[in-house]
Amino acid sequence: MIPAQDITGLILAGGRGSRMGGVDKGLQTFNGMPLALHTLTRLQMGGGVGQIMINANRNLAAYESFGASVWPDGLADYAGPLAGFLTGLEHCETPFLVTVPCDTPRLPLDLVPRLAAALEAENADIAMVAAPEIGKDGQVRLRPQPVFCLLRVELLESLVRFTQEGGRKIDAWTALHKTAVAPFDLPHDDPLAFFNANTLAELHQLENNPA
């Protein structure tokens, strides 16, 4: 098993928050606490990381008050979560980086160990979450959740090259590397663990649906 001190957690809070009316999503309140602080607390409680960073592009002092180092995108114009991956890898001082978005306050406490186990089992470069999702046909299928990733820091050079060539899609980049999948469909897994609140209405819906 990969020791916790070899893994840095990265909370992705650098988006525009367009579907929330342009607000800074990570600072929106969920059950009395900012979303990003919920995420940080869950990572700490899980014990799978040695340190935590936050990727944010505004209100940096507010994020710094959570006690983590904060780094803005190196790419311009809110280039998306892959820009956050790049920022995290550039500043990561451990062999592995795990990425999580700021808007999933119910992420599993065992997220990091399960990603690490999947990566080691397949000797992969990347491990990615797959979570159950109900399709339009009513069938439940496992769907990749590419913003929940465990990455080897040696991938930095590859990501620099990919973004310099104009690449911005996570799945297009991860497809270039051996990627393991960690399914989160066990009976005890929270079905809303990876539900990301894109609108204020969805955030309130999640608040009213306790785990």
From Swiss-Prot:
Pfam families: NTP_transf_3. Mg(2+) binds at residue 103. GO terms for cellular component: cytoplasm. GO terms for molecular function: GTP binding; metal ion binding; molybdenum cofactor guanylyltransferase activity. SUPFAM superfamilies: Nucleotide-diphospho-sugar transferases (SSF53448). It is found in: Cytoplasm. GO terms for biological process: bis(molybdopterin guanine dinucleotide)molybdenum biosynthetic process. It comes from the Bacteria. Its EC number is 2.7.7.77. GTP binds at residues 12-14, 25, 55, 73, 103. It catalyses: Mo-molybdopterin + GTP + H(+) = Mo-molybdopterin guanine dinucleotide + diphosphate. It is an enzyme of class 2 (transferase). Keywords: Cytoplasm, GTP-binding, Magnesium, Metal-binding, Molybdenum cofactor biosynthesis, Nucleotide-binding, Transferase. Its cofactor is Mg(2+). Belongs to the MobA family. Monomer. Transfers a GMP moiety from GTP to Mo-molybdopterin (Mo-MPT) cofactor (Moco or molybdenum cofactor) to form Mo-molybdopterin guanine dinucleotide (Mo-MGD) cofactor. The N-terminal domain determines nucleotide recognition and specific binding, while the C-terminal domain determines the specific binding to the target protein. This is Molybdenum cofactor guanylyltransferase. It comes from Albidiferax ferrireducens (strain ATCC BAA-621 / DSM 15236 / T118) (Rhodoferax ferrireducens). The gene is mobA.
